[in-house]
Amino acid sequence: MLRDEVAVSARTLQWKCVESRADSKRLYYGRFILSPLMKGQADTIGIAMRRALLGEIEGTCITRAKSEKIPHEYSTIVGIEESVHEILMNLKEIVLRSNLYGTRDASICVKGPGYVTAQDIISPPSVEIVDTTQHIASLTEPVDFCIGLQIESNRGYRMKTPNNAQKGSYPIDAVFMPVRNANHSIHSYGNGNENQEILFLEIWTNGSLTPKEALYEASRNLIDLFIPFLHAEEQDQNLKDNQKNGVTLPFFTFHDGFDKLKKNKKEIELKCIFIDQSELPSRTYNCLKRANIHTLLDLLNKSQEDLMKIEHFRIEDVKQILDIIQKHFVVIDLPKNKFLIGNPSE
């Protein structure tokens, strides 16, 4: 009943992009409206959306530089105009776009004289440099400029700490937020009805994604936060039915399937198959992500018992995951009835 009411009330609401522009490679702007809203709803949505845009969207950046030849962060190197600290600040500003999870290694190796720019970064295929002209260093003499880099995807902002420093390795303040700023304003609907409002939402991004993409990601993250409330009654009923029928969920691990996968002729690189390639429903996808399950390898290393410990995860989700893996990768041959919920005697 609740979902029906939500669907009916949402039919009259309309999103519209009223302005979109790219001021530079690293500055995109978009303005959107949502209307008509009842009085008070615009502020509720605007505040929640701004928080989600600034804090809930993942971004990618350089989080560490490595070189055994650098004595300390505030040193200078012969033949390089900038100090090490200035180079680290320039690396902090590099804007990256990627679909990676966790950390990856990259590097720069250039011989002077000349300029070192973002174009000189040797990165994994899953990482794209948004603006290859971003300046890193100026080499005034024929010196070798070779450093290792660590690239990471995450959310929010992370300050470097003294405890995070290692010899020859220099942490960088990480700004993972792809949304630079977000504002909302509320206006009268203009039909003489003071109880109806229009929400205007302005979004500025760093170029790693468009304002429209940011709006989609923020909306999806907010929806995922509220989905458990919509399913609460349904989950309670499933639990009562299972207890009533005396059903014991079968213990199953993905290791059998993993063994077959390793023997597959195609030798699929499990680490390169991300769960977002498998067309999982957004709720299941986000449950797995929050449990640090990002690739097919991560998934196949989990047992059903492990998966059922994930918050908001259900036995139906396990069955659905298996069905999708069988459909797309055709490597696991297990009887589907092991996952059916109900009275075994039926």
UniProtKB/Swiss-Prot annotation:
This is DNA-directed RNA polymerase subunit alpha. Its main location: plastid. It catalyses: RNA(n) + a ribonucleoside 5'-triphosphate = RNA(n+1) + diphosphate. GO terms for molecular function: DNA binding; DNA-directed RNA polymerase activity; protein dimerization activity. The N-terminal domain is essential for RNAP assembly and basal transcription, whereas the C-terminal domain is involved in interaction with transcriptional regulators and with upstream promoter elements. DNA-dependent RNA polymerase catalyzes the transcription of DNA into RNA using the four ribonucleoside triphosphates as substrates. Its EC number is 2.7.7.6. Belongs to the RNA polymerase alpha chain family. Residues 268-346 are annotated as: Alpha C-terminal domain (alpha-CTD). It is found in: Plastid, Chloroplast. Pfam families: RNA_pol_A_bac, RNA_pol_A_CTD, RNA_pol_L. One of its GO terms (cellular component) is chloroplast. Keywords: Chloroplast, DNA-directed RNA polymerase, Nucleotidyltransferase, Plastid, Transcription, Transferase. It is an enzyme of class 2 (transferase). In plastids the minimal PEP RNA polymerase catalytic core is composed of four subunits: alpha, beta, beta', and beta''. When a (nuclear-encoded) sigma factor is associated with the core the holoenzyme is formed, which can initiate transcription. Residues 1-233 are annotated as: Alpha N-terminal domain (alpha-NTD). One of its GO terms (biological process) is DNA-templated transcription.
